[in-house]
Amino acid sequence: MKFLEKDLEDIICKSFTNDYYNGLLVKKGLDLLDRHLWWHKRQLRIYGCGIADLVISHRNPYHKDNIHVNVIELKRGCINGESVLQCNKYIDGISKYLDTRGINHTISGTLIGDRLNISSTFLNRDDLFYMSFYTYSYDIDGIEFIKHEM
């Protein structure tokens, strides 16, 4: 059986609307949500930047005038420097959109792939400070995620 990027997207999206599935993903090593999910979009077209795989937003109940956006980019293969640049392009596009509308926000990126290979030229970039990196493996026991610190 071939595991596709869309399959990974389907698995993750189930967790956005179902606490049981979210709990399973957390046990498997992937923790993307807090209790205050506001909205999520699949295949979000970002004007002038491309299409982000998943975008989720959290709203803090104590600071309703501020939202946090997480751009989630899925890779069937390796996460590399191009993946980081692609995710940063989406982050910049969304941030500009929210800025022009006067919406207070913070924004981060999450990259998920089956391998991680980021050259040292990217490790010194400020952009990595707001990024999370996960690798996954898929076998007879299901899917497992490992978070990598940069």
Q: Where are the language model's segments positioned?
A:
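Charged, terminal alpha-helix-loop-beta segments
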Residues: 1-150
